[in-house]
């Protein structure tokens, strides 16, 4: 019951985010376009507890998010990296930059579908 309520609320949140992003691009949206972008509803929850031997830690690895939107809630440990498309003061082009966690904040990743 709790998982179904979570799915319902998170699906609406993702829809609202997509509508805001695409709307800012000046694209008129209707339900068929939104359904095409969002595809089949999917929720994936990953939890990585602290490893007593950090040198043995294995994460998801370098990847891009294939869907439209990924919503992340980081813990205080961190481990989220972003590949830099352009050079800036923090990292060079093509380098991976760690994104430090902000307590209580959600990270919104734009996936391959929208990109």
Predicted regions, residues:
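Peripheral, non-catalytic segments flanking oxidoreductase cores
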Residues: 1-115
């Amino acid at each position: 019951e709790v998982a179904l309520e979570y799915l319902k609320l998170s699906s609406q949140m993702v829809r609202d985010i997509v509508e805001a992003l695409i709307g800012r691009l000046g694209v008129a949206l209707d339900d068929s376009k939104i359904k095409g972008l969002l595809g089949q509803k999917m929720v994936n929850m990953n939890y990585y507890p602290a490893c007593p031997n950090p040198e043995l830690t294995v994460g998801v690895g370098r990847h891009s998010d294939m869907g439209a939107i990924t919503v992340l809630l980081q813990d205080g440990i961190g481990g989220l990296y972003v590949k830099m498309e352009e050079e800036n003061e923090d990292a060079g082009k093509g380098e991976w930059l760690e994104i430090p966690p902000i307590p209580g904040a959600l990270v919104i990743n734009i996936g391959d579908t929208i990109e």
